[in-house]
């Protein structure tokens, strides 16, 4: 794809691209916005470096892509900026958000379309990289009989497994979000099919006995985590990663304890996952 207002350099053949030639602190013109959107659709995750954003500018960039999402758990948010989630780990941390392969908040009935993570502080000796995986390729490289099987299945995504279990948070009124989604979802923009299960939130496949569900999910997890489907982003201060939750998974490396890593995430609302044959 030819770009006029931005420069795009692919990270790997499978997924990821670094974008340059744009200052995200400034209002985006229509052409720059459209080309950034196109780069995201083409590469599933896009990276920007050397960006200086206030919380308001971070939110303004996110709002160009849609209404902003409020996280369902009681994880830290920036005071007076409920749309900005604090992503932090240090010597006091007993867990780090995102250290399993996942798509963000897939337990919601309408999971986010994308997430925009802005990194401010990093460990002094490196580490804290984020891995991303192409879920189009995860589906497309399954054998045809397995593709057909998965296209007829749905799965339960349960927020209690993460927020109540790993994070130890008390459930909000009405409980943590819990939803049933197709195992293979159709991307609403590209029309391509992506595998849509993840270790964090998916608890079982509907209609299968537990041993069958567990075995199939584990096989799909292992397959979707194939290195050839991945890229790895090495963060620098003031870097941004913007990923498409509808067709990409990610995994945050926690290899820097007890050092500090601090970032801020804005998340864009999405729509209800669907499957089109």
Model-derived features: positions:
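Non-heme Fe(II) oxygenase catalytic core, chiefly the N-lobe of the double-stranded beta-helix
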Residues: 2-240, 245-277
């Amino acid at each position: 794809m030819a770009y006029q207002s931005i420069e795009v350099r692919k990270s790997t053949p499978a997924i990821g691209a670094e974008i340059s030639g744009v200052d995200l602190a400034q209002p985006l013109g229509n052409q720059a916005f459209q080309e950034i959107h196109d780069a995201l659709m083409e590469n599933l995750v896009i990276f920007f470096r050397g960006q200086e954003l206030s919380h308001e500018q971070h939110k303004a960039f996110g709002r160009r892509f849609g209404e902003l999402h409020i996280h369902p758990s009681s994880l830290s948010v920036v005071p007076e900026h409920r749309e900005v989630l604090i992503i932090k780990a240090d010597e006091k941390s007993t867990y780090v958000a995102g250290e399993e392969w996942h798509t963000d908040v897939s337990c919601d009935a309408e999971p986010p379309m994308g997430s925009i993570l802005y990194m401010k502080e990093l460990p002094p000796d490196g580490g804290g990289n984020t891995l991303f995986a192409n879920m189009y390729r995860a589906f497309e490289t399954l054998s045809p009989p397995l593709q057909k099987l998965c296209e007829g299945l749905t799965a339960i995504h349960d927020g209690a497994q993460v927020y109540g279990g790993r994070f130890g948070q008390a459930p909000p009124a009405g409980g943590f979000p819990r939803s049933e989604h197709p195992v293979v979802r159709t991307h609403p923009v590209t029309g391509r099919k992506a595998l849509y299960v993840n270790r964090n939130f998916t608890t079982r496949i509907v209609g299968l006995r537990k041993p069958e569900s567990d075995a199939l999910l584990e096989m799909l997890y292992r397959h979707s985590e194939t290195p050839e489907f991945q890229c790895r982003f090495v963060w620098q201060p003031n870097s941004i990663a913007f990923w498409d939750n509808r067709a990409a998974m990610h995994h945050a490396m926690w290899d820097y304890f007890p050092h500090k890593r601090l970032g801020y995430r804005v998340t864009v609302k999405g729509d209800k996952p669907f499957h089109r044959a």
